Amino acid sequence: MDTESNRRANLALPQEPSSVPAFEVLEISPQEVSSGRLLKSASSPPLHTWLTVLKKEQEFLGVTQILTAMICLCFGTVVCSVLDISHIEGDIFSSFKAGYPFWGAIFFSISGMLSIISERRNATYLVRGSLGANTASSIAGGTGITILIINLKKSLAYIHIHSCQKFFETKCFMASFSTEIVVMMLFLTILGLGSAVSLTICGAGEELKGNKVPEDRVYEELNIYSATYSELEDPGEMSPPIDL
């Protein structure tokens, strides 16, 4: 009887709250892991404002490059098909003789199309291809600006030497026409170069962002979470109740 009364007394005593804080188990579904939500929830610095703007305007910059290439190609086709630039003295069409309206248009059109495709499909190989193409277009654009500036100086020098004030003369008309065409192509090339450099910066930023969190580290953290979850859920390691 004494033993039974002691058991009832122990059961009637209030249980003191445990000082050890309870662990909150966070369940992670395989769908969240495969979709990359766990990777996104990891603490990572936010993107810069300028990089976010470039990412959103990637397709627009690609279209700008394509339009620049088409207009430069049209200028080159018209000048080379209508005029015999090889027999014009003064070298006022030196940029056309160098073929810049054609190979510059090829560089800008390729980089523009790759930028649009990579924005829509967002594949790794397309992003890297767009980065390489825009880097090449930046170099081609800088080279083209140098060629056009040299051509513009030669045209202005020709106009100044011959004192071209009567534009109905053939030579003066050619020099003035060359100056206007070269100025427009220079403006378009600067526009295309700005787009190519912006897309190059955007692609480089995406590459650096992708290399910040290694895949091995992510899998290691997943293994730690899985082991902790299995230990908390394993009923075999729980202490058996003490019989009083």
UniProtKB/Swiss-Prot annotation:
GO molecular function: IgE binding
Lipid metabolism among keywords: no
Superkingdom, taxonomy of origin: Eukaryota
Transmembrane segments: 60-79, 98-117, 131-150, 181-200
Positions on the Extracellular side per record topology: 80-97, 151-180
Function field: High affinity receptor that binds to the Fc region of immunoglobulins epsilon. Aggregation of FCER1 by multivalent antigens is required for the full mast cell response, including the release of preformed mediators (such as histamine) by degranulation and de novo production of lipid mediators and cytokines. Also mediates the secretion of important lymphokines. Binding of allergen to receptor-bound IgE leads to cell activation and the release of mediators responsible for the manifestations of allergy.
Protein name as annotated: High affinity immunoglobulin epsilon receptor subunit beta
Organism: Homo sapiens
Gene it is expressed from: MS4A2
